[in-house]
Amino acid sequence: MTNVTDATSWVLAARTSHDRLAGLVAGLDGDGLRAQSYDTEWSVADVLSHLGSGAEIFSLYLDAGVTGGDPPAPEAFMPIWEAWNARSPEDQAARSLAVNEALIARLESLTPEQRAAFHVMMFGRIPMDLAGVLGMRLSEHALHTWDIAVMLDPAAKVAPDAVDLLVDRLPVMAGFMGKQDPAAVAVAVTTTSPERAFTLDTGGVTIAPAGAGDTPAASLALPAEAFIRLVYGRLDDAAEVTASGVTVPELKSVFPGF
């Protein structure tokens, strides 16, 4: 396979995200696990259950990518979800951390040759290298970790090393996360930490690297961490956001979250 992306930084960020989550959960009792997460329909334990089942499923994809075997069929997922849903909040929390630790340890054990040769077909149609698969996993894990962290500390942010990687995946994610806006507007987006320049089209819900000839009618300046949370439907604090020609509520309606 050509154009393989080095997965080292993704593996490191996945480890950091897991360790951060483990630290958050370590201080929670039964009431804390049953408390609401940022998602109004999920408790903290529900988030952990989701991440635990996700770790099991991604482990199946990891095995397929390393061995060259077939990826898991969709019908393999339902028994995993049902098993997690049947567990108590305490068991969901403990098992979630255990299965994700096992996933991270497996990733860390892969040789450079195994990482470079990794190839798997996701969802039956999308070929991915290891960095691509970890991009999917990190976006899920880092944002859901924030869903828990922000309920414990309202000033919590998405982990910086995850931000550095995930900001460049926003063009890939926009179509999945966005809701097309009939009143389309082109927005020049500039971010800090790290610095990036994008053009956001709310009509087709696309994000692309800014071009030299782009002349958007609106502009948005904000930290990259806040832009990620905007795209993932999690931007409630707009103190560091400067918008012109478009409002933050209008942009939030384009990205309702998951």
Question: Where is each model-derived feature located?
Answer:
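Surface-exposed helix-capping loop/turn segments at secondary-structure junctions
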Residues: G27-L33, E108-R115, V150, P154
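Short, helix-capping/interhelical loops that line the mouth of catalytic, cofactor-
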Residues: M1-S9, E56-S109, E113-F118
